[in-house]
From Swiss-Prot:
Converts 2C-methyl-D-erythritol 2,4-cyclodiphosphate (ME-2,4cPP) into 1-hydroxy-2-methyl-2-(E)-butenyl 4-diphosphate. HAMAP family: IspG. It comes from Salmonella gallinarum (strain 287/91 / NCTC 13346). The keyword Transcription regulation does not apply. It comes from the Bacteria. The gene is ispG. This is 4-hydroxy-3-methylbut-2-en-1-yl diphosphate synthase (flavodoxin). Binds 1 [4Fe-4S] cluster. Its EC number is 1.17.7.3.
């Protein structure tokens, strides 16, 4: 593994979404949002469980009606991951899901009602120890801010966020996190930079409405990557017009790429050329699918020839360097074996699983020794 100086994260206060710590140095949480009808309890539960399986720390669920709130009660009883209820316009829905054990409320104080209604929601959240996320979005800025600035700007998003923060400050409530999302990468990044200088609360990162699976992943990687590399951000969501499971995968890929939080295999693979001695692309695609269940952090390099292969293998947990008929296998930088190119996928899967088990056992022993 390549050595690098750790990113110095912005200091923030600590809140808890269910049992997940947010801020104050806690691991950056990766979350997604269901796209089922919340009133379809079975479909929503199945999607949440699919998100849990790929590592989601938190899942947000839209609760637009009282019927959805009743469904939320049933959903909450069937899943383990903390749930955030996304509430707009009707403060009574927030009060209802609070009764049903919601782990966090995502509200916009600007559309939830008057001061008295906001106070009722905040008092309920305080009594039940439920944090709140203030969610500001460039696409739904208050009309007076639209008129003042003419268009969404970083200053407009900041002013909107601070207006809502002031709502909670006046009510002496500090268990909250804030987001200032936009679909434009530069607008979102600058808005978060400004906000990070103004408040101490945790920040939830996102490039909203980023696009489809490919373009949305690229936009999110650029925007979130810039902020995370500057130490800004305590939770994140990659917003894609795609299966929410992909949001979690891309989120962890961003964190892995920045070496902020490792989960699963970090594949290093060449784009291939006429020098490749085996099917690199097919091997990588197959292994990514077969090894999705592996959560052990490890770097695996799969290089088709001897130009860059040995160098990458030296800094990988496991590395393959393409050779004629057989390819070299490296473990922790040391050449260990040769693999038959015609059976590369099965052999490499077996070696990776064995290495993951070995690393897991070593960590288990380390934990036991520390506990003693």
């Amino acid at each position: 593994m390549h050595k690098q100086a750790p990113i110095q994260r912005r200091k923030s206060t600590r809140i808890y979404v269910g049992n997940v710590p947010i801020g104050d140095g806690a691991p950056i949480a990766v979350q997604s949002m269901t796209n089922t009808r919340t009133t379809d309890v079975e479909a929503t539960v199945n999607q949440i469980k699919a998100l849990e399986r790929v590592g989601a720390d938190i899942v947000r669920v839209s609760v637009p009606t009282m019927d959805a709130a009743e469904a939320f009660k049933l959903i909450k009883q069937q899943v383990n991951v903390p749930l955030v209820a996304d509430i707009h316009f009707d403060y009574r829905i927030a009060l209802k899901v609070a009764e049903y054990g919601v782990d966090c409320l995502r509200i916009n104080p600007g559309n939830i009602g008057n001061e008295e209604r906001i106070r009722m929601v905040v008092d309920c959240a305080r009594d039940k120890n439920i944090p709140i996320r203030i969610g500001v979005n460039a696409g739904s800025l208050e009309k007076d801010l639209q008129e003042k600035y003419g268009e969404p700007t970083p200053q407009a998003l900041l002013e909107s966020a601070m207006r809502h923060v002031d709502h909670l400050d006046r009510l002496n409530f500090d268990q909250f996190k804030v987001s200032v999302k936009a679909s434009d990468v530069f607008l979102a990044v600058e808005s978060y930079r400004l906000l990070a200088k103004q408040i101490d609360q945790p920040l939830h990162l996102g490039i909203t409405e980023a696009g489809g699976a490919r373009s949305g992943a690229v936009k999110s990687a650029i925007g979130l990557g810039l902020l995370l590399s500057e130490g800004i951000g305590d939770t994140l969501r990659v917003s894609l017009a795609a299966d929410p499971v992909e949001e979690i995968k891309v989120g962890f890929d961003i964190l892995k790429s920045l070496r902020i939080r490792a989960r699963g295999i970090n594949f290093i693979a060449c784009p291939t050329c006429s020098r490749q001695e085996f099917d690199v692309i097919g091997t990588v695609n197959a292994l990514e699918q077969r090894l999705e269940d592996i959560i052990t952090p490890m770097d695996v390099s799969i290089i088709g020839c001897v130009v860059n292969g040995p160098g990458e293998a030296l800094v990988s947990t496991l590395g393959v360097t393409g050779g004629n008929k057989k390819s070299g296998l490296y473990e922790d930088g040391v050449r260990k074996d040769r693999l038959d190119n015609d059976d590369m996928i099965a052999q490499l899967e077996s070696r990776i699983r064995a290495k993951a088990s070995q690393l897991d056992e070593a960590r288990r022993i380390d934990v036991l020794q520390v506990e003693k």
